[in-house]
Regions:
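Alpha-helical transmembrane segments and membrane-interface helix-loop junctions
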Residues: 1-162
Length: 162
């Protein structure tokens, strides 16, 4: 592959992944909102509570957190220790930022692989109210990890070609 095309390909994959995550988050938040409003409505007007609504909302919130983290990676919104880095001159500052991003990438690879191993190990465990495999709840970590890897990779490529 021509290395000149890498930044464009990386950016395209990053943008497609961002769009997919945004659509997923809109759907997740919409479903979560409807379920919670319906639950509150039933509880206060009819003194009836759904056994599964809080569990669904909890798992949707977990999915939203991991997916949303990839958008925070793309836009550099995660907490960072910039005080020390900003004291460096431009050359070393760029090198430190590059090493930090590569370290984050390596962490995310381990996080994603570890998350997949945990999800697989818990595939036979059922959730308390819904009785579906906990694999799907724990799958949020590796899926979010993949989307974060895509975004940090794109950031590394962008920094490399500057």
């Amino acid at each position: 592959m021509d290395m000149g095309k890498l930044p464009r390909i990386s950016e395209k994959i990053s943008n497609i992944s961002e769009k997919a995550v945004r659509y997923a988050l809109v759907g997740i938040v919409a479903v979560m909102t409807v379920i919670i409003i319906f639950q509150v409505f039933l509880r206060y007007l009819f003194l009836f509570s759904l056994s599964w609504s809080e569990e669904v909302a909890r798992y949707l919130m977990i999915w939203a957190s991991f997916l949303g983290a990839s958008l925070a990676v793309k836009y550099g919104l995660h907490i960072g220790v910039e005080y020390l880095v900003n004291r460096f001159p431009p050359g070393p500052k760029r090198a430190v930022a590059f090493v930090a991003k590569v370290s984050i990438l390596l962490f995310l690879v381990f996080f994603t692989v570890g998350g997949l191993q945990v999800a697989w190990a818990l595939r036979d465990q059922d959730s308390p109210a819904l009785l579906f495999s906990m694999f799907y709840a724990y799958l949020s970590a590796p899926v979010g990890g993949v989307f974060m890897i895509i975004q940090i990779w794109n950031s590394i490529v962008e920094d490399w070609v500057k």
